[in-house]
Amino acid sequence: MSKKLFALLFVMLMLCGAALADGITVTDMHGREIALDQPATRIVALTPSDCEILCAIGCEDALVGRGKYCDYPESISALPVVQSGAETNIEEILALDPQVVLMSDMSQTEEQAKLLEQNGVQVVISDANDIAGVYT
């Protein structure tokens, strides 16, 4: 398993895993530190790869919303869909009251991440620009 994939899986598992006495601090693929007092129970994932990985590691119950291109696994089809990609809709995301938003540097902008953070949402940015960025 590559270091990038392991790091991404570790970040996601820590975001929705068992509570730790001292809270959780993880570093995303851009070197940004994300600190939570306890595991996230309300996550919006904007990219298909992030949705699939969260579900694969048993964190599907923490998902409260998904990007418009997130359609697998089928079990997430009932989740609210938010506009993602170049037209990511911050208001739609905030209406879901997430603790954490998982986004890609390919589709979302630093300005969008800052807007979410200004509204109290932790943002984890992945490097999903190509297949290698997701899986290597």
Ranges and model annotations:
Residues 22-26, 32-36, 42, 99-101, ...:
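Extracytoplasmic substrate-binding proteins
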Residues 41-107, 112:
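A short, structured surface patch at a secondary-structure boundary
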Residues 4-8, 101-104, 118:
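Solvent-exposed, charged interface segments at domain starts and junctions
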Residues 4-11, 16-51:
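Bacterial Sec-exported substrate-binding components of ABC uptake systems
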